[in-house]
Amino acid sequence: MTPNNNVMFDDASVMWIDADYIYQNSKMPLSTFQQLLFSIPSKHRKMINDIGNPACNPPSCSFPPSNSTVKYMVDIYGAAVLALRCPSLFSDQLLTTFTANNYLSYCNRQRPCPQPPCPQPPFDCAQTQILDALEKLARQSDLVVNSLNQISLNQSNQFLELSNTLNTVRAQNAQILAALETTKDAILTRLNALVDDIKAALPDQSAQLQELADKLLDAINSVAQTLRGEMNNTNSILTNLASSITNINSTLNNLLAAIEGIGGDGGGLGDADRQALNEVLSLVTEIRNILMGTARK
């Protein structure tokens, strides 16, 4: 590559390259190029106007103003960021021979070798200055290229890791959604089956339980009625027996009183007869007390 009118040099001898010139030769999509251009730090990128631009003075600006359009200029660092995005023969020449030839042309214009006191070939002095400048430029270019390669490699690795992570998360989300759908369908199926079973089983069981409850209630009522009748009969028998015993006791008392009256009148009952009657009275009284529940313990 030979020097052309797409570069300019500022007061610090920093070379600035037209970004449009790099875009036209890099064969890069416009959106990608613009994204890279605006990602370059501002100290390595500047915007100038072709007409009336104080930064483009006749001694240092190598290309003439053409119109009033705005141009973006980048230094060697910015040019490396743009050119190394898609490595090609142009990017290799841009960062080597293109830069060297433009600096050589700039040095020949801006730093003429003073005439020495003694006659010496002017080529030797200019060659020494050019070689020193080129050596410094080569070292700076190597550092810039190495830094950009490392940055590009790190960014590529980070993008790859991020892409893999996103793909993994996407796959896990798909698996989770599928599992949730399967679980939901299974739960709904089981619930529907359970509801159907309950609806089918509860009416029969309710009728059976009601029938058994009615039978049990009838049996309990029958037993209670029977027991109630038996108890009433037993109570009646006991009441009648107690009344009979009371009547017997009254009869015996009357009989005893009559017998004692006879004995008081000088009747024929002796002590032995009287004792036998008393024993009969005691026995009947004891039987009555037992039947009426008043027996002595």
UniProtKB/Swiss-Prot annotation:
Record's subcellular location: Virion membrane
Keywords assigned: Membrane, Viral envelope protein, Viral occlusion body, Virion
GO CC annotations, alphabetized: membrane; viral capsid; viral envelope; viral occlusion body; virion membrane
Molecular function terms, GO-annotated: structural molecule activity
Keyword Oxidoreductase appears in the UniProt entry: no
Family: Belongs to the baculoviridae PE family.
Function, in words: Major component of the polyhedra envelope.
Protein name per the record: Polyhedral envelope protein
